[in-house]
Curated annotation (Swiss-Prot):
The gene is bioB. This is Biotin synthase. Residues 58-285 form the Radical SAM core domain. Residues 1-25, 340-360 are annotated as: Disordered. Gene3D superfamilies: Aldolase class I. It comes from Ralstonia nicotianae (strain ATCC BAA-1114 / GMI1000). One of its GO terms (molecular function) is 4 iron, 4 sulfur cluster binding.
Amino acid sequence: MQHAPLNFVPDAAKVPPTPGQSPNARWSREAIEALFALPFNDLLFQAQQVHRAHFDANAVQLSTLLSIKTGGCPEDCSYCPQSARYDTGVEAEKLMPIDTVLEAAARAKQNGASRFCMGAAWRNPKPHQLDAVADMVRGVKAMGLETCVTLGMLKQEQAQQLKDAGLDYYNHNLDTAPEFYGEIITTRTYQDRLDTLEHVRDAGINVCCGGIVGLGESRHERAGLVAELANMEPYPDSVPINNLVKVEGTPLAGNEALDPFEFVRTIAVARITMPKAMVRLSAGREAMDDALQALCFMAGANSIFYGEKLLTTDNPEADADRKLLARLGMRVEVQDHLHQAEGAQHSHSSHCHIDITPAD
């Protein structure tokens, strides 16, 4: 009986070379839909090949996300429990004191995180609010952690203020495809989001931009989201992929759950189309069993949010995360800012690994 060689790729898995490797090439939505349509094993095989070409396939970055200002947001994002328009049980809170934030960052670092993200439920920050966040960024940076904030829309001078404070990444997601966006949000336009991303990039801050699946979108629209991200010039350094967390009181609380394999496909397609980006397994991970998370790592996810609340939704317990990664033989990547905006786009600086030992 003959066996195919280890490097055998079936015809169904063969697609054109990755356009993302050419500065002037663009991904058509049709090409992205063709990736989604591949047999599952072929898609994961291709995604894993791309992943190994650019990253250590057994390394994962641990990120911690802290909600520094929770609730009371005036926007109407239909998935979000922090909107003041919905009765979700989330109470509006004031901006956290800087000492509280820095204590949380220190705990995150002690628990193995190398990236600390701060999120505030604002449409856009006011000057005094941004001053406070800039101080937080300086304090977290001084601990040797990679910094990211998500604060809503920014003007150019606000982005520059954050850059001057030493911010590494600014997160501002597109959420979904342009044609489906109006079904989810009406208080902020797609162009508003693109404008903020332009200001962030012009300031020299690394872009963190992804989306949410399971909003009720079609596969065609999921492909549209990936196309928007992959065709940015350049594509984002950091791409969080969120699976809708259905929260009682929000308009999407009754949505039908996305097929778990479709979520894995989305991770794989993001990896193939944005080969050098950090693909972050974000909201919704708490509902995934260990096998599904392992498939996401196989598909090219190389960062997880770890150990704290993911804004206002539960994230898996830190010890469970440690045990899972240890069972998979994965290592924690300790990074000295993977992507520096001052250097070459998507270049990687030195990094080392630490083994994960689960707590007793």
